[in-house]
Design a protein with these regions (language model features):
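Cyclic-nucleotide recognition modules
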Residues: 72-128
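Glycine- and acidic-residue-biased ligand/ion/polar-headgroup-sensing regions
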Residues: 37, 48-59, 76-77
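A small-molecule sensor/coupling module
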Residues: 111-148, 152
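Short beta-strand segments in beta-sandwich/barrel cores
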Residues: 30, 57-62, 104
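Functional cleft and adjacent loop/helix regions within the main domain
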Residues: 73, 107, 136-139, 152-171
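Phosphate-/nucleic-acid-contacting segments
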Residues: 156-210
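Cyclic nucleotide-binding regulatory module and flanking cytosolic helices
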Residues: 1-36, 79, 85
């Protein structure tokens, strides 16, 4: 079972918070619940809060009149906000949708800005978080351009293992619908099905050889 992070742990991941900041941050965060496929942040609307995922899984999605793209997935401890809204007061270019039943904390921009005036380390937290997000997006872009769909799938299943375990894929597809997973990989659902079949057959051959 995935460990559910505390707000203190999320703060400490990107700064050295004072006890007062931890207390104030915790009091300011409102816990919300989302059902599967609920919209947490609406595309093309002004976002007015930071979203911190406590449990569950979300996706960052972009829609046009005739297409839909899944850009990234979010899990426990991930933070999201629309920087177009936070910096410029403009509508969000992206949306956030729950893939599973999820819990998330929300902190309004107004409250967050008030806290930055009292706690400079919160600015450090935001800066370090944004640098981490930039690094993640760079990695995602390079992986998308330089790796095959099969390699991208293996990376998503388990970043720490270079081999394929069929049960990992089965677990992932029970959480993430094939349509959404194919969007993320930049392939069609039928191509995803072929890749899955090839990987499972390869894994069986490797198991038989040992």
């Amino acid at each position: 079972m995935t460990k559910v992070p505390t707000l203190e742990e999320i703060l400490r991941a990107f700064c050295n918070p004072s006890p007062d900041l931890i207390n104030d941050f915790t009091r300011s965060a409102q816990l919300n619940h989302a059902s599967r496929y609920d919209t947490i942040v609406a595309q093309d609307q002004i976002c007015d809060r930071f979203i911190i995922l406590r449990s569950g899984m979300t996706r960052i999605v972009h829609r046009t009149d005739d297409s839909e793209d899944t850009l990234l997935f979010g899990t426990s401890g991930d933070v999201f906000t629309a920087m177009q809204s936070y910096v410029y007061g403009k509508p969000s270019r992206l949306g956030v949708e729950a893939i599973t039943r999820s819990e998330y904390w929300a902190i309004s921009y107004h409250r967050f800005r008030s806290m930055t005036e009292c706690y400079p380390e919160l600015i450090t937290w935001l800066s370090n978080y944004l640098m981490g997000q930039t690094a993640t997006l760079e990695d995602f872009y390079l992986t998308l351009k330089s790796k095959s769909a099969e390699e991208r799938l293996l990376r998503l299943i388990d970043r720490e293992h270079s081999y394929f375990e069929p049960e990992k894929f089965d677990k992932l597809t029970k959480i993430v619908p094939s349509r959404i997973l194919a969007q993320y990989l930049g392939i069609t659902p039928s191509s995803l099905s072929r890749i899955r079949k090839n990987l499972i057959e390869r894994a069986k051959r490797q198991n038989n050889a040992t």
